[in-house]
């Protein structure tokens, strides 16, 4: 074990005697350097503070001149916090004495993590009241919010820490501050079921505001299923009749899909129905639907107490009611609307009703693409779910275990929607598309193409498929490392796109159809690797031969001056199956000589040949 690791382990484990022995006779500059070096993303002081070793913290600061501010990576409850200063780690872990020591040694009380979380927020999160008080006494700013605009008061409310919330309010915390998404502390109480804190916030002048999705705290409580909050707020005289009705109906939908309590749902729907009909001269009717939705099996919302009573005999109809109610009240842009449509579809798939699942998922996907930004993680998740479902259906069909077939139209429809998502993304210039999400979307498309190759189709369908693949390639999308779709098709890492296996890559079939549809065989990635280079790295001679037959230049070099043949593994059979001499022309040999001897060639030979020589650099 090297000295750096030994020092790190000793600091983490609080072994002061061992640490002092390790640093014995070391030059001061060497010790200071050791204090700033990181193991697994953390300095020795950060680890000592995280685990509450006060004597170690004091020793590192006083004797080793450790920096009191250098942040690093620390783990709390399975989550890695990046850029956490020692004071943040000690505050989060509840080590008051260490917090005192760090502040005495000059730690900045408002120094934040990479997500802009302060030590005060860390203490509020885990309910360390004494540390909260101590930090505030030492000028901690109550109003510094994290990157989501979430304040110390908000997190205290969400986590149900009443005493901390009360202390912050007494110290002047802004009770009506809004997060980036428009949440207030009242929303956090509603989402966590913290009724006592909510009542306290109202005494301090908290207002019932809507968030970015148009959600009031009352609706937030309905979505999360906190009946205590819903009951309290529906009795509030300031809550309108319509708001009460919507809250009770939405709570019923939550009981169906989240709590799986159909009788509980009926109870709240009956209360709402009674409220709708409480004034015979002014019945509050539900809006008439413009169209009935095929994905919901053409269900319509019940309008009378009698219709509601009849639901008890039809659980499936109740589940459709829940989806209809949620979409009406929350609207299509709220994440819960599409989430529970997808959830219901998954339940159908688990019971073998794949057609209902596909219809619901298609409806949810349309909703997401119409309302979310391009390459939203939620949309990508929907597309991936389709790929996984179709893969499962094809496998079970092949084994003779499944009566339902995957149709060309189903698969092709999702491929078209996936290509549309890429089209939306590449047209978005500000901000540019997220490379990780774009790479994932490209990989999903290749998996869908792979699955399509397993489904029989007519000549017209085959033409339509190739038309769409051509349109996809003409968008010239580039994923991580500037990979083109052809690079991804010949890379084994494309296999790992989700939790469940879909298709295996490199894929000869996908490579072949991409080439047939016009993929550039000599396109380069960020390191000037062609698809041939990537195929060589993956030791796939069949695909390499296919690429060469399609015009791939065999001895072109990447930015490390390597040809594809140089990248083949000596231990693999592929090296023996690829014969460079069969693919090397006299023109190639001449270009290599020009490059090797640095012979002037620009403006001496035709422009076409200049680009040819460049391939051999």
From Swiss-Prot:
It holds the Pfam family Ank_2. GO terms for molecular function: ubiquitin-like ligase-substrate adaptor activity. GO terms for biological process: proteasome-mediated ubiquitin-dependent protein catabolic process; protein ubiquitination; ubiquitin-dependent protein catabolic process via the C-end degron rule pathway. Signal peptide: none annotated. Keywords: ANK repeat, Repeat, TPR repeat, Ubl conjugation pathway. Pathway: Protein modification; protein ubiquitination. TPR repeats lie at residues 245-279, 338-371. The keyword Heme does not apply. The keyword Repeat applies. SUPFAM superfamilies: Ankyrin repeat, TPR-like. It comes from the Eukaryota. ANK repeats lie at residues 2-31, 40-70, 82-111, 115-144, 148-177, 181-210, 213-242, 481-523, 527-556. InterPro entries: Ankyrin_rpt (IPR002110), Ankyrin_rpt-contain_sf (IPR036770), TPR-like_helical_dom_sf (IPR011990). GO terms for cellular component: Cul2-RING ubiquitin ligase complex; ubiquitin ligase complex. Belongs to the fem-1 family. The first seven ANK repeats at the N-terminus (1-242) are essnetial for recognition of Lys/Arg-Xaa-Arg and -Lys/Arg-Xaa-Xaa-Arg C-degrons. Substrate-recognition component of a Cul2-RING (CRL2) E3 ubiquitin-protein ligase complex of the DesCEND (destruction via C-end degrons) pathway, which recognizes a C-degron located at the extreme C terminus of target proteins, leading to their ubiquitination and degradation. The C-degron recognized by the DesCEND pathway is usually a motif of less than ten residues and can be present in full-length proteins, truncated proteins or proteolytically cleaved forms. Component of a CRL2 E3 ubiquitin-protein ligase complex, also named ECS (Elongin BC-CUL2/5-SOCS-box protein) complex. This is Protein fem-1 homolog C. It comes from Xenopus laevis (African clawed frog). The lineage of its organism: Eukaryota, Metazoa, Chordata, Craniata, Vertebrata.
């Amino acid at each position: 074990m090297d000295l750096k690791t030994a020092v790190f382990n000793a600091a983490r484990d609080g072994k002061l005697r061992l640490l002092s022995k390790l640093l014995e006779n070391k030059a001061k500059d060497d010790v200071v350097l050791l204090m700033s070096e990181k193991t697994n993303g953390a300095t020795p002081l950060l680890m000592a503070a995280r685990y509450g070793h006060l004597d170690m913290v004091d020793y590192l600061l006083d004797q080793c001149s450790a920096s009191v501010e250098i942040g690093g990576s620390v783990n709390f409850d399975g989550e890695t916090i990046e850029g956490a200063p020692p004071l943040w780690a000690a505050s989060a872990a509840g080590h008051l004495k260490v917090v005192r020591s760090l502040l005495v040694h000059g730690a900045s009380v408002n120094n934040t993590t990479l997500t802009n979380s302060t030590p005060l927020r860390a203490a509020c999160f885990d309910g360390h009241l004494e540390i909260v008080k101590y930090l505030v006494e030492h000028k901690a700013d109550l109003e510094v919010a994290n990157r989501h605009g979430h304040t110390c008061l908000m997190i205290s409310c969400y986590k149900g820490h009443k005493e901390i919330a009360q202390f912050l309010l007494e110290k002047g915390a802004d009770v009506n501050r809004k997060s980036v998404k428009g949440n207030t502390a009242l929303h956090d109480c509603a989402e966590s079921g913290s009724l006592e804190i909510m009542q306290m916030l109202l005494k301090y002048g908290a207002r019932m505001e809507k968030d970015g999705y148009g959600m009031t705290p009352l609706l937030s409580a309905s979505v999360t299923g906190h009946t205590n909050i819903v009951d309290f707020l529906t009795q509030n005289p300031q809550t309108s009749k319509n708001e009460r009705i919507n809250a009770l109906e939405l709570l019923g939908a939550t009981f169906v899909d989240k709590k799986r309590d159909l009788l509980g749902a009926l109870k709240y729907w009956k209360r709402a129905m009674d409220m709708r009909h409480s004034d015979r001269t002014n019945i509050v009717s539900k809006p008439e639907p413009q169209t009935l939705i095929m994905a919901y099996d053409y269900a319509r919302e019940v309008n009378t107490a009698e219709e509601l009573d009849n639901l008890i005999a039809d659980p499936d109809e109740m589940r459709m009611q829940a989806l209809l109610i949620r979409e009406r009240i929350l609207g299509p842009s709220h994440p819960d609307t599409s989430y529970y449509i997808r959830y219901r579809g998954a339940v159908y798939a688990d019971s073998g009703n794949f057609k209902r699942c596909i219809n619901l998922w298609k409806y949810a996907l349309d909703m997401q693409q119409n309302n979310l930004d391009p390459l939203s993680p939620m949309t990508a998740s929907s597309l991936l779910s389709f790929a996984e479902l179709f893969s499962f259906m094809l496998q079970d069909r092949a084994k003779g275990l499944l009566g339902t077939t995957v149709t060309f139209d189903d698969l092709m429809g999702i491929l078209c929607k996936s290509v549309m998502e890429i089209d939306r993304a590449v047209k978005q210039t500000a901000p540019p598309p997220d490379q990780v999400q774009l790479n994932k979307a490209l990989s999903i498309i290749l998996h869908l193409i792979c699955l399509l190759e397993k489904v029989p189709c007519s000549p017209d369908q085959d033409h339509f498929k190739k038309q769409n693949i051509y349109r996809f390639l003409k968008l010239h999308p580039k994923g991580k490392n500037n990979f083109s779709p052809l690079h991804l098709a010949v890379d084994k890492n494309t296999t790992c796109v989700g939790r469940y296996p879909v298709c295996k890559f490199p894929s000869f079939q996908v490579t072949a159809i991409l080439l047939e549809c016009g993929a550039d065989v000599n396109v380069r990635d960020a390191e000037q690797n062609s698809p041939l280079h990537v195929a060589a790295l993956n030791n796939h001679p069949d695909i390499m031969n296919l690429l060469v037959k399609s015009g791939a230049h065999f001895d072109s070099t990447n930015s490390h001056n390597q040809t594809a043949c140089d990248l083949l593994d000596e231990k693999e059979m592929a090296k023996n199956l690829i014969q460079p001499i069969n693919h090397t022309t006299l023109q190639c040999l001449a270009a290599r000589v020009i490059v090797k001897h640095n012979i002037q060639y620009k403006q001496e030979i035709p422009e076409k040949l200049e680009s040819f020589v460049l391939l051999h650099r």
